[in-house]
């Protein structure tokens, strides 16, 4: 799938937050994807025609970006193009939560990705949340499956172990690196990468499982190189971008279908 992605080089439109825009763009370029970053409402009709997929990230939400996201969903939905929603911090404020619900209720979102607190809040499971990180008491399988069922989406829940569900099946993906939680934008780039893989129009559940596995293996490879060179967060970030650009043989042993 990665080889096909790089051959096709899809154009992926990102309505993302200003904290991570450059990192997301560089990460997509490393993947072999052409990034397009725009939140100008007037551009949405034209950009929907030329882009292969859309990723919406509400990390720095405001009234203008809300209107832009709504218009973008309307345009991409009409063209039957994949849309990924990353409801960043939706468990932290009423504005984020209400906006996430409104975007999901548009029925244009094909994939919802977030952490346990974010997905948990959207399905009514109480989670303890601080900033963009989360701790939860409900089982991850319950949260991700319920999210997929409630919103008729592929649900992707990231963390130490990733979980992906279509509402019927749940698959878990292990591996990765603790450094992913120590850099800004890892989740935001993950959402954009989700949109990239979905642009290939393959089975969406399998596409998200493959993406999660690749992302974790790239992170593990970057951590290994960083530690070998006595590095930490900073060097991990650079090695991670390198790893995203390299061919990686997926380890299927890290993927498990849950009961």
Swiss-Prot record:
MF-aspect GO terms: ATP binding; hydroxyethylthiazole kinase activity; magnesium ion binding
Binding site for substrate: 37, 185
Catalytic activity: 5-(2-hydroxyethyl)-4-methylthiazole + ATP = 4-methyl-5-(2-phosphooxyethyl)-thiazole + ADP + H(+)
InterPro entries cross-referenced by the UniProt entry: Hyethyz_kinase (IPR000417), Ribokinase-like (IPR029056)
Required cofactor(s): Mg(2+)
Residue sites binding ATP per the record: 113, 158
Cross-referenced CDD domains: THZ_kinase
Keywords: ATP-binding, Kinase, Magnesium, Metal-binding, Nucleotide-binding, Thiamine biosynthesis, Transferase
A GO biological-process term: thiamine diphosphate biosynthetic process
Pfam families found in the cross-reference section: HK
EC numbers for this chain: 2.7.1.50
SUPFAM superfamilies xref list: Ribokinase-like (SSF53613)
Pathway this chain belongs to: Cofactor biosynthesis; thiamine diphosphate biosynthesis; 4-methyl-5-(2-phosphoethyl)-thiazole from 5-(2-hydroxyethyl)-4-methylthiazole: step 1/1
Family of the protein in this entry: Belongs to the Thz kinase family.
NCBIfam families listed in its UniProt record: PRK09355.1, thiM
Function statement: Catalyzes the phosphorylation of the hydroxyl group of 4-methyl-5-beta-hydroxyethylthiazole (THZ).
Protein's name in the database: Hydroxyethylthiazole kinase
């Amino acid at each position: 799938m990665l080889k096909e992605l790089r051959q096709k080089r899809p154009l992926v439109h990102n309505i993302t937050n200003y904290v991570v825009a450059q990192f997301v763009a560089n990460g997509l370029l490393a993947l072999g994807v052409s990034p397009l970053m725009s939140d100008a409402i007037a551009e949405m009709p034209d950009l929907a025609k030329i882009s292969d997929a859309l990723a919406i990230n509400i990390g720095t939400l405001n009234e203008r970006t809300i209107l832009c996201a709504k218009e973008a969903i309307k345009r991409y939905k009409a063209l039957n193009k994949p849309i990924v929603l990353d409801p960043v911090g939706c468990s932290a404020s009423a504005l984020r939560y209400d906006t996430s619900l409104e975007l999901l209720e548009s029925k244009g979102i094909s994939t919802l990705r977030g952490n346990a607190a974010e997905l948990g809040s959207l399905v009514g499971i109480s989670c303890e949340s601080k900033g963009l990180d989360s701790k939860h008491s409900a089982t991850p399988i319950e949260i991700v499956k319920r999210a997929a069922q409630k919103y008729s989406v592929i649900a992707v829940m990231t963390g130490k172990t990733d979980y992906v569900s279509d509402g019927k099946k749940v698959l878990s993906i292990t591996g990765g690196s603790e450094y992913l939680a120590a850099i800004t934008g890892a989740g935001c780039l993950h959402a954009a990468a989700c949109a990239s893989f979905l642009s290939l129009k393959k089975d969406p559940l399998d596409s998200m499982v493959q993406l999660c596995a690749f992302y974790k293996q790239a992170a593990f490879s970057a951590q290994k190189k960083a530690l070998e060179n006595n590095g930490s967060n900073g060097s991990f970030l650079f090695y991670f971008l390198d790893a995203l650009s390299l061919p990686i043989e997926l380890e299927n042993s890290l993927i498990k279908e849950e009961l």
